[in-house]
């Protein structure tokens, strides 16, 4: 077990610690993406309808969003290492439960439990990176983390398709078992403990319940809207969400260490970074959901061509994210974020202005701009969110980072559904235009951070 370090772990312990983070976050992100590809197969095998099989995906996402902040708070209480190891155990066992499921109900329950395990991993992974890396190299750690998330998100469908071509859908989950065991052994050997703190915060159960209801109802309503559910049901969910949310926020304002980190949101640099994150992930999801419809329906490209034309975006993000991690050590995150998001907006506007029959190269280079711009923004923004919070509140900052990402992505997907319902085939153009405008707004908000002092790890 590594000793507590004042400024990061020494080598080679640092390599072992970051490896367990890489494996854990890869599994959590991949399992959010691979199930989509397998839904038709799962529905057929378990004798379920396509509509009901969507809950295999929804259950995982909802479980994550309702528990992220609670697990991050528990990380501040009991240590990020302990929560991470518990998350690995839950994720490993629930993956086995998923593979052994013989009904849709059983699989959905297993996915809920797996979502809680994934939330435990996501809630403290960036807080752990803050403990693993020395202050001067923290940007590189954030760059590696952003790189892994980008690779996992992009590779998820491909990995799922490869596994399904040679094995049953159960192996999508069984593959997590050996990986989880390796990650757990590495975590027990290399992950550092939290530093000592003067007092331990108290976990407030009513806050956790209200947090789950508020964010769970919001994500359920957004997902339901995107899937064309009853507007009456969606409106009822939103009304209950608002009522519970008001009581939730009022309670947080009265607590010395709140579950929803309103204390951190009072820090201008932190709140501006969270706002930038929500807007940028909303813009990203608006584009990524609408682009396949645009390429196939409007431009007449095949499914294979669509996949190839979309590939430059995640590839550019993967290349740029580690580079941005190095740049944050020298350039203000607000400037890097603004520049990256303006580049992303330029790529999106270029896609909006494409002619009726564009050459492939004229689709590819805007995709590269979008991916490179997003990669230039993401690592510095994550770095700022974590380092603008006090060290003892790193868990709260890490949980808020993940929550902002999920809220942005869910909102973006719902907006695409709205645009397609309102504007038909033109909805893809409107969605891309909305994404570009949101990217500009996010760039402007990021630019406001330049007036704030640079965060210190």
Swiss-Prot record:
Q: Which InterPro entries match?
A: MFS (IPR011701), MFS_dom (IPR020846), MFS_trans_sf (IPR036259)
What is one GO cellular-component annotation here? plasma membrane
> What is one Pfam family matched by this protein?
MFS_1
- Can you list the disulfide-bonded cysteine pairs? none
Show the CDD domains listed in the entry: MFS_MMR_MDR_like
Q: Which GO terms describe its molecular function?
A: transmembrane transporter activity
The membrane topology of this protein is:
Multi-pass membrane protein
Tell where it localizes. Answer: Cell inner membrane
User: Where mainly located?
Assistant: membrane
> Which keywords does the record carry?
Cell inner membrane, Cell membrane, Membrane, Transmembrane, Transmembrane helix, Transport
Q: Which residues cross the membrane?
A: 15-35, 54-74, 87-107, 112-132, 144-164, 166-186, 205-225, 229-249, 269-289, 308-328, 334-354, 357-377, 400-420, 428-448
- Gene Ontology biological process terms in this record: transmembrane transport
Q: Which family does it belong to?
A: Belongs to the major facilitator superfamily. TCR/Tet family.
Output this protein's name. Uncharacterized transporter YebQ
The species this protein belongs to is: Escherichia coli (strain K12)
Q: Report which gene this protein is encoded by.
A: yebQ
